[in-house]
Structures are given as C-alpha cells and as structure tokens.
Amino acid sequence: MQLLKQIWNERRSNGWLWSELLIVFVVLWYVVDWTYVTARTYYEPVGFDITDTYYLELSLKNDKSNSYLSKEQKSTSLGQDIIELTNRLRRLPEVEAVSISNNARPYIGSNSGSMLRIDTLVSSPLRRSVTPDFFQVFRYQSADGRGYQPLVQALRNGNVVVGENFWPKDYKGDRTLLGKEMVDVDDSTKVYKIGGVSKKVRYNDFWPNYSDRYVAIELPEKIMVELDDELYPSSVEVCLRVKPGTSRDFAEHLMKLSVNQLSVGNLFILKVHDYEDIRNDFQQESYNQVQVRFWMMGFLLLNIPVSYTHLRAHETR
C-alpha cells in the first residue's frame, strides 16, 4: 500500500514514464495482433504444391543467330513449336508432367479476368487458361478429396473448373457448383459448364482472401497450333513437375539439353526457374515487412523493462 501511495503522490513527475509505457503497450498489442494474424494466414493451405516444379522462360532466336530460321524457311507456327517442345520435355525420364498456361501459374502477379453470370450472381473471377496437366503439375486438389485427376478430366471433357469458395460468403441461393452453367456477360453465346471443383486456391502465402476466386478454362492445342505472330513466348507459361528424388541439378541439366534437343525452330529455353526461388522473389516484400515487425516487437519488449527500471529508480529516490 505504501508503494501505491508513493506512486500516486508522484504521479505528475512519473506521468511521462506511464505515458511511454502506455504507448509501448498499445503499439506492442498492434504488432502482436498483426503477427498472429499474418502467421495464421501464412500457415493456411494455399491449395497447390510447388515441390519439384519448374517454370521455363522461353525466347526466340534473332536473325543474328547462326541457327535462325526465316519465315520462308519455317514450316511450323510458334504455337506448334511450343507444343513440340512440351512433347519433348514429357519424354525426359525425370519429368512427370508438363503444362502450358497463360496468366495462371502461382506467384505470377499477372492476371486475366472474366465476368460471368451463374444463377443470379455476376462474378468477376480470375481467368486461368491452362492445359489439363496444369492441375497435375501444381497438385490442385479436388474438393471431394480425389486428388487432381477429376480436375484434369473436367477440362478434357470440355468443361471448366472453379474453386470451392466461388460463391461469396453472404450468397443466400443454392450453393451447389458442380454441373452448373456460367454465361459470359460480355458474350452470351459463351456458356461454360462446371465439371470440376477444387479446394480453395490462394493467390499467395500472405493474402487471406484477395483474388482467390478463379475459373480454369482449357487452352486447347488446336488453338495453340494456329497462333504465330500474335503469340509471344513471354506470355506462354511452360511449367513442369519432375519425379520425386530427381537431382537438384535438374535445371542445369535441362539447360545443357536445351541447345540441341530442346530447341524447336527459333524457340529455345532462355532460363529454367526453380519454383521455390519464384515464390521467394515474389514474396520478398512481405518477408521484409514481417522481419521489420519482429524487430519492432523485440525493441518494444526491451523497452518495457527499461522503462520500469527507470520508474523504480525514480521512486526509490
């Protein structure tokens, strides 16, 4: 009681210390709360798996290359060359699956959108144009627990795939997805049937709900083969998954093969990117932000006993 009376009697002289402690407490509470929410979000399933996966950055030879082919010398389109490249990749003993996509691969930061009507709801999900093997490469999981195979088959049947979280949380109508039809708002002649439903697919490890609704539409080979001058290698995502146990030197091995075995027409592999590196580079800003918050939390935790020591020393005097 004597200590409390002394603190009360000296409340004016100790006011700045108590104010400092209050500010520290408020800021610390904010940082701890932010850290908890961020950590909980980070460890939630992302809906895909990038283990043993690679992205192949493609490019074209220019007329200064000794092996460059002019338009008169070429008998194939760029789309045909890309398909031939993926077929050669599939024949490699280390490769499990290869996919072609556009604005669809994880951690890309580049998107395509669609405006679709399903029942009475108009939604604007991300549009992911992919070949069926995309789901095998990145291990999307069917909402019914049967793995990626139902999603692969859905695209092969000419249907589309959506995530199980396609409906807004406040939607009161029938929340069934499988078998329903969606109409393109901009072109009512385009009608898509939902043939597969995946588990929720997040945009990255740090965003809980942003851009996590999507519709996957098949990118048919018959359309690819017709594309030439209007197609740019940088807009084509060739990704692959290697078999478990494959050497970590696979990217280097692939680049050695690219000179002779994997060069098609003027198309060649410019670089092979390990997907773990893509993930880290894409999220580097978020990692830095987390690091700064941890330093702040450490500083504030250190500041509390220092302020308390100052307060006790002042009370002793």
Regions found by a protein language model. Give the residues of each.
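A short amphipathic helical element positioned immediately N-terminal to and/or at the very start
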Residues: 1-8
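Hydrophobic C-terminal alpha-helix "anchor/cap" residues
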Residues: 7, 89-90, 258-259
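Membrane-helix entry/capping segments
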Residues: 9-10, 262-300
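Short, strongly hydrophobic transmembrane alpha-helices
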Residues: 12-40, 48
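Alpha-helical transmembrane segments of integral membrane proteins
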Residues: 17-27, 296-308
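Membrane-proximal extracellular/periplasmic loop immediately following the first transmembrane helix
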Residues: 34-122
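Mid-to-C-terminal secondary-structure elements
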Residues: 103-281
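Single conserved hydrophobic/aromatic residue that forms the stacking wall/gate
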Residues: 310-317
